[in-house]
């Protein structure tokens, strides 16, 4: 999906068996044909996979599961290292921040961002009621059952931090007191990582050089553009597409005419 890590659809099987669905949760039930979509991913381990073990006090199983995950999916981390869990948590925090910044950069809204739908490998999974922004609306919610807008487009970055905190809590039975404090410090770095990646992607969309640093002017520029798009109900994707068609001469001419 636009170069963003995601599970992939492998097959679709449709039968003549009838199923009833209330697609928009408004009481209008319809009969449809049953179908099964088979999706592929490197693994289906999620934050919720570890949460469940911690809640049920299955510490030994939690320990062996985390060790399995590190050995099989995080090859750069030595599972025998005493700080391997911190290394794992840090990598997941960084990768999740980058993933959500990528979502925001293309207007993707997942729909159901609970911990059971957040991959430990930071790939996009379980996005049933997803949607993409059309006219720019930060409060866009594709899931009609999300009445409070908890998983709106604008809320996704904060939900990412919320879910990562749940992962931190799930790992606590395996951490020393010192490591628990270090994990909290790692989590505090999430916002900065997300913001940096977000700015890099949006500056790239606007045709600017993608530097590792950005200024307050850059942030203000992006914020003003998005506010204009919100006020005018401009199409999110087409706005950037149309901007890419402008030449430097056209932009300079427009600036001169403004003056």
Tell what function each PLM region has:
Residues 27, 31, 105-110, 114-173:
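Catalytic activation segment of kinase domains across protein kinase-like and atypical kinase folds
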Residues 64, 68, 98, 102, ...:
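Alpha-helical scaffold segments in soluble metabolic enzymes
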Residues 148-259:
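Regulatory N- and C-terminal appendages and interdomain linkers associated
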């Amino acid at each position: 999906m636009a170069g963003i890590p995601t599970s992939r659809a492998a097959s679709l099987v449709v039968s003549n068996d009838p199923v009833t669905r209330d697609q928009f949760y408004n009481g209008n039930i319809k009969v449809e044909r049953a179908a099964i979509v088979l999706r592929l991913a490197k693994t289906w381990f999620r934050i919720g996979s570890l949460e469940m073990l911690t809640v049920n006090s299955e510490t030994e199983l939690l320990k062996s599961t985390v060790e399995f995950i590190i050995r099989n999916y995080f090859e750069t981390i030595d599972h025998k290292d005493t700080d391997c869990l911190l290394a794992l948590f840090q990598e997941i925090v960084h990768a999740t921040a980058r993933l959500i910044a990528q979502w925001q950069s293309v207007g993707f809204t997942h729909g159901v961002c609970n911990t059971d739908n957040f991959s430990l490998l930071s790939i996009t999974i379980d996005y049933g009621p997803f949607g993409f922004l059309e006219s720019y609306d930060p409060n866009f919610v594709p899931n009609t059952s999300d009445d409070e807008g908890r998983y709106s487009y604008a809320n996704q970055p904060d939900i990412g931090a919320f879910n990562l905190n749940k992962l931190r809590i799930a790992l606590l039975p395996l951490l020393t007191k010192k490591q628990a404090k270090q994990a909290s410090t790692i989590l505090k770095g999430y916002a900065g990582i997300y913001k940096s990646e977000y700015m890099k992607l949006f500056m790239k969309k606007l045709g600017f050089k993608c530097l590792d640093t950005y200024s307050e002017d850059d942030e203000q520029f992006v914020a003003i553009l998005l506010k204009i798009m919100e006020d005018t109900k401009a199409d999110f994707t087409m706005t950037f597409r149309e901007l890419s068609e402008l030449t430097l001469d056209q932009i300079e001419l427009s600036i001169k005419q403004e003056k």
